[in-house]
Amino acid sequence: MKPTNEPKKPFFQSPIVLAVLGGILLIFFLRSFNSDGSFSDNFLASSTKNVSYHEIKQLISNNEVENVSIGQTLIKASHKEGNNRVIYIAKRVPDLTLVPLLDEKKINYSGFSESNFFTDMLGWLMPILVILGLWMFMANRMQKNMGGGIFGMGSAKKLINAEKPNVRFNDMAGNEEAKEEVVEIVDFLKYPERYANLGAKIPKGVLLVGPPGTGKTLLAKAVAGEAHVPFFSMGGSSFIEMFVGLGASRVRDLFETAKKQAPSIIFIDEIDAIGKSRAAGGMISGNDEREQTLNQLLAEMDGFGSENAPVIVLAATNRPEILDPALMRPGRFDRQVLVDKPDFNGRVEILKVHIKGVKLANDVNLQEVAKLTAGLAGADLANIINEAALLAGRNNQKEVKQQHLKEAVERGIAGLEKKSRRISPKEKKIVAYHESGHAVISEMTKGSTRVNKVSIIPRGMAALGYTLNTPEENKYLMQKHELIAEIDVLLGGRAAEEVFLEEISTGASNDLERATDIIKGMVSYYGMSSVSGLMVLEKQRNAFLGGGYGSSREFSEKTAEEMDLFIKNLLEERYQHVKQTLSDYREAIEIMVKELFDKEVITGERVREIISEYEAANNLESRLIPLEEQAS
């Protein structure tokens, strides 16, 4: 399908601009006439000169003028010099001697009107015409952006460009299950008669759900690319405008265009922009533009397509829980395909896809990079590869090395290294104790994740240091002891400050907030406390966007007080436990702090080595948690 967008005309070929220029020229032309229809002296003159009234009278007295025209406020005197006629113009002043002087010198004189009907009329009409022209210009621009004319404002044809993507399933790695779910969609589009002969009904819609950056749009393009069918793509927000009824009209145009080129695919990205549930919290939302657009979408999905010329709707969202139930029923979106974050093998495959065209050194180990990036989506991995290439180029390297990839991972997780942010030795010491506390507790707590690196170099917007914990695999479930372990690790920084410096700082504010949220989830959502038992008190907001827990109160004031007391007591209990552990390993932490102060960065291996050496020197039983007992 050829793009329907017409090429823009040059600015000076715009009808409105031409009309304005024509009006200006017309004004100048009409001003050249006198009120009786004859050409004015100004138009016939070769030149005009503005002079004083005294000079005009002097010219008359010296017989240097031939004709004089007297107006209400102006006086004109004409004089012919050879083939040239000169007009002298002056402001008129009350003077009873002027006419006798003209009679005495026998100079022709007459009166003239300083305005005429045409210019007076244009003086009234021009402001109206200018305002009308500007209004038409703005309305025309708005209508073009909306894809329609004055009487076809809702047309979406100019917004729709069919494409045939060259993306294939081989270009998308890390989501094999999702690809398997949509492979038969390709078969439906290629051979619709095979299924029609069997009496099978082709799915009308497939909803792709998952966290941001996991490749939902790429998967939709791959389906169209494999099936070799037209691909119509629009964002959910593209349907909504300020004019009521415009969204519904665009939906009609989109489906009408797709049906003309069937078999084809319609892809609606971020469908939650128009597909949000019409009943929010038990209250019906207003009959607004979004609701009309949704109703039209529901009607179109009920009545379009045939078995021999199918049109399949693919849609993507990371907020499936807010979609309208009518949109999710069978017959509309028959299937939901989860496009989740990749596991270890998936991350390796995604990295292999994105390193194509990147010059890699021999020391690059993609498996190690995949271990460091658990929990990251495909878009994050693509960004890491690109960031590593940029780092290599910035360092004037000819190849991307493993160190560049590791640095890119740290940038993605912890933020940009702030070498220019100078902190005082006192603050540096506080940060060193804080991060050492996190690291030691992480290595000595069952269910926590292994330490990969400890740094006191500022990164990101606010972090003055960080402890990089990298689980080797994504976590889909967490046991109670793992949640407790995470709380202990978060409290380790604050506890180290109090144990070793005997004073606390503001650096643990985010740690305390996260620890509180974990316990709140245990009480109100996971049923892991005596306060709520198995009762769920709050609902999780969004599984894919990490929205935390709902703020709606579905419990009594007494229960709220018990929740607050439970959270406070558990935090205090874990805090005392962490402080005792750090006190037991005081000398090991002092060694760690000294190395951090000198080197600014130490590895996880060095952290474990310091703890092991301290335990061996003091004949202590090892409290280091083996790798197999840590969260993986």
UniProtKB/Swiss-Prot annotation:
The GO molecular function terms of this record are: ATP binding; ATP hydrolysis activity; ATP-dependent peptidase activity; metalloendopeptidase activity; zinc ion binding
Chief localization class?
A: membrane
The record's top EC class is: hydrolase
- State the active site: E435
List positions binding ATP: G210, P211, P212, G213, T214, G215, K216, T217
- Required cofactor(s): Zn(2+)
- Per the record, ranges on the Periplasmic side are 31-116
Origin superkingdom: Bacteria
Residue ranges of the TM segments? 10-30, 117-137
This protein's GO cellular component annotations are: plasma membrane
By its UniProt entry, which Pfam families does this protein fall under?
Answer: AAA, AAA_lid_3, FtsH_ext, Peptidase_M41
* Membrane topology annotation: Multi-pass membrane protein
| GO biological process terms, semicolon-separated | protein catabolic process; proteolysis
Give the subcellular location: Cell inner membrane
The record's free-text note on cofactor binding? Binds 1 zinc ion per subunit.
Topological domains (Cytoplasmic): residue ranges? 1-9, 138-632
Indicate the family of this protein: In the central section; belongs to the AAA ATPase family. In the C-terminal section; belongs to the peptidase M41 family.
The record, for PANTHER family, names: AFG3 LIKE MATRIX AAA PEPTIDASE SUBUNIT 2, ISOFORM A (PTHR43655:SF2), ATP-DEPENDENT PROTEASE (PTHR43655)
Query: What is its quaternary makeup?
Result: Homohexamer.
Its name, as the record gives it, is ATP-dependent zinc metalloprotease FtsH
> Which species is this UniProt entry from?
Helicobacter pylori (strain J99 / ATCC 700824)
Query: What phylogenetic lineage does the species belong to?
Result: Bacteria, Pseudomonadati, Campylobacterota, Epsilonproteobacteria, Campylobacterales
